[in-house]
Swiss-Prot record:
It catalyses: XTP + H2O = XMP + diphosphate + H(+); dITP + H2O = dIMP + diphosphate + H(+); ITP + H2O = IMP + diphosphate + H(+). Signal peptide: none annotated. GO terms for biological process: nucleotide metabolic process; purine nucleoside triphosphate catabolic process. It comes from Corynebacterium efficiens (strain DSM 44549 / YS-314 / AJ 12310 / JCM 11189 / NBRC 100395). This is dITP/XTP pyrophosphatase. The active site is at 72 (proton acceptor). Its EC number is 3.6.1.66. Homodimer. Its cofactor is Mg(2+). Transmembrane segments: none annotated.
Amino acid sequence: MKLLVASNNAKKLGELQRILDQAGIENVELLALADVPSYPEPVEDGRTFTENALIKARAGASNTGLITLADDSGLEVDALNGMPGVLSARWAGKHGNDQANNDLLLAQIADIPEEHRGAAFVSVCAIVTPDGREFVEEGRWHGTLLREPVGTNGFGYDPLFVPMEESLIEGRDRSSAQLTAQEKDALSHRGKALRALVPAIAELAGQ
């Protein structure tokens, strides 16, 4: 079975491949957007992660005829009333400028004391089939925000985010950008949402 992942982010494809391998699901070939003929990029104008994930997955399925998986994710900061939320990737104005997004967020919460620097990464993953079936799952990852970026393994807001699981271990305060890929898979918001979709993928693959 071919499964289009509506992204060109190699780290996202790698994460899903590792999760499928761990679940023992075989005969699923993951394709990135670069592997299929280009089609008009859908406008992500949803007001929720779920709406945006479905917009991307529906566009992939309708334009390519392939079962399509898409995710929409972001960071919800308690002190900012849940923002940047669905605007996370373009918080500083330009889509995908991690440095600018991190700098702006740090400036906005500079005066927030440690006990109020809570945040959560949220990911909604959606699968849409060409015949219109839809599967949607959400994952959340709670933690706190640092005052400066630490680590080089992740992307987005990873260098600012200390997972709750790390905070509970005395002497450990690693950011999610300091975790190994395997550690992040086990804990992350996207990992949780993707694992919740494994039964649907297995069903679609006839396993």
